[in-house]
Swiss-Prot record:
Residues 1-15 have a biased composition (Basic residues). The gene is rplP. Part of the 50S ribosomal subunit. Gene3D superfamilies: Ribosomal protein L10e/L16. It comes from Borrelia hermsii (strain HS1 / DAH). It comes from the Bacteria. Coiled coil: none annotated. GO terms for molecular function: rRNA binding; structural constituent of ribosome; tRNA binding. Pfam families: Ribosomal_L16 (PF00252). This is Large ribosomal subunit protein uL16. The lineage of its organism: Bacteria, Pseudomonadati, Spirochaetota, Spirochaetia, Spirochaetales. Binds 23S rRNA and is also seen to make contacts with the A and possibly P site tRNAs.
Length: 138
């Protein structure tokens, strides 16, 4: 699963996501993309599940790019632990996704197959998504 190799600070305050994406909102590498229509923190496990679903659907054909990376730590205290005694340890890593963020890109497969694979991956994610095609291909 994806996680940062090294971080400046181990733990972080949660914060809140709002607004639309100004970076990472255009298709850069592939021909097709999966774009978020919601704002959410997506876990590394969800990203991996979507990637596996896509690659299995296209059966070794084409190339897939993951455009989001889980670099925000999510801490959690152990079960049945009393409050206090400091912040819990890092449980997993999240990727912040805003409205309009291109999460996955794909190239080298027919449009119908790419759309089917992206929709399958979309069902593994907690956000509403849409399938987009690079402008110069239309």
């Amino acid at each position: 699963m994806l996680s940062p190799k090294k971080v400046k600070y181990r733990k972080k305050q949660r914060g809140r996501l709002s607004g639309e994406a100004h970076k990472g909102n255009k298709i850069s590498f592939g021909e097709y993309g999966l774009v978020s229509l919601d704002t959410y923190f997506i876990t590394a496990r969800q990203i991996e599940a979507a990637r596996v679903a896509m690659t299995r659907r296209v059966k070794r054909g084409g190339k897939v790019w993951i455009r989001i990376f889980p670099d925000v730590p999510y801490t959690k205290k152990p079960a049945e632990t009393r409050m206090g005694k400091g912040k819990g340890g890092v449980d997993h890593w999240n990727a912040p996704v805003k409205i309009g963020t291109v999460m996955f890109e794909m190239a080298g497969v027919p449009r119908e197959l790419a759309e089917a694979a992206m929709m399958l991956a979309s069902s593994k994610l907690p956000v509403k998504t849409t399938f987009v095609v690079r402008r110069d291909l239309r």
